[in-house]
């Protein structure tokens, strides 16, 4: 019988770009513009931030996994006064550190991939991880390490469907490629059930900020679709006819550590 964790891994594998498409790509498609991870002066509240904040003691600590600029951490400072960021890119940790100075919090950073660096990462009152889980095939050790580093609560934010789903029409139009419809956020609850972790999932909506935060957002989409620069005009025309939605469906999955 296939476990929920095995299904999660196999479903994610369906999202691999076919080799023949990837091999012809002039530019690597898996780019993350730093502008996407900049945080505003005033962070809009969300259900994810609320669930993290309500478990945070005054003056407590938050550990942000795959932190980027740290929106998951700085949204709850205060009441948190100490932030810890984990990221694979030093550029993101530098951004996280600079933001800590702006928000007036003490800061620690850990360079590396989660959960490989978990043992060298401090424990915190609340652990947050925003928009990372859909990149993780080996999901059980990832979740177990989150649980082990939280004193009070773990809060995970993910889109309801795979984050690349908003480009499915583009893949069909330019490559006649049908993209998967699995996994979905609720599948993580099944994995957590298998781990004997009693978690709650709640749904809400949030903004899509790609075109607002990234100069040349259409070029970003072109690269994600493995198309060369000379086809940018076709991309621009396609996006004009099929604009990205302004809102997206999100889920927050959280549990209190026993």
Language model regions located:
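A short glycine-rich, Lys/Arg-flanked "PGG" loop and its adjoining helix->strand segment in the class I
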Residues: 140-155
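A short acidic, Gly/Pro-enriched loop at the edge of an enzyme's catalytic core
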Residues: 119-126
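Conserved class I S-adenosyl-L-methionine
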Residues: 1-56, 153-180
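A short SAM/SAH-binding and catalytic strip from SAM-dependent methyltransferases
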Residues: 126-138
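Conserved Class I S-adenosyl-L-methionine
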Residues: 200-258
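Short alpha-helix
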Residues: 181-196, 202
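Class I SAM-dependent methyltransferase SAM/SAH-binding core
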Residues: 63, 69-116
């Amino acid at each position: 019988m296939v476990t929920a964790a095995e299904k999660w891994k196999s479903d994610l594998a369906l999202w691999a770009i076919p080799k023949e498409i990837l091999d012809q790509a002039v530019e690597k498609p898996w780019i993350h513009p730093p502008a996407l991870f900049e945080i505003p002066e005033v962070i809009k509240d969300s259900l994810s931030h609320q669930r993290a904040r309500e478990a945070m003691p005054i003056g407590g600590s938050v550990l942000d996994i795959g932190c980027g600029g740290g929106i998951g951490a700085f949204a709850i400072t205060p009441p948190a006064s100490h932030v810890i960021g984990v990221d694979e890119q030093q550029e993101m940790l530098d951004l996280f550190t600079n933001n800590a100075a702006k928000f007036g919090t003490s800061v620690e950073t850990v360079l590396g991939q989660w959960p490989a660096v978990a043992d060298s990462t401090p424990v915190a009152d609340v652990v947050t991880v925003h928009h990372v889980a859909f990149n993780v095939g080996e999901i059980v050790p990832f979740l177990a390490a989150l649980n082990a580093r939280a004193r009070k609560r773990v809060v995970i934010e993910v889109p309801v469907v795979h984050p690349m789903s908003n480009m499915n029409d583009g893949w069909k139009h330019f490559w006649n490629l049908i993209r998967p419809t699995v996994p979905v956020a609720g599948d993580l609850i099944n994995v957590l059930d298998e781990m004997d972790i009693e978690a709650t999932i709640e749904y809400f909506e949030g903004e899509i900020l790609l075109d607002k935060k990234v100069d040349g957002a259409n070029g970003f989409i072109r690269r994600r679709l493995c198309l060369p620069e000379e086809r940018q005009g076709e991309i621009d025309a396609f996006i004009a006819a099929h604009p990205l939605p302004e809102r997206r469906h999100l889920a927050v999955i959280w549990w209190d550590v026993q």
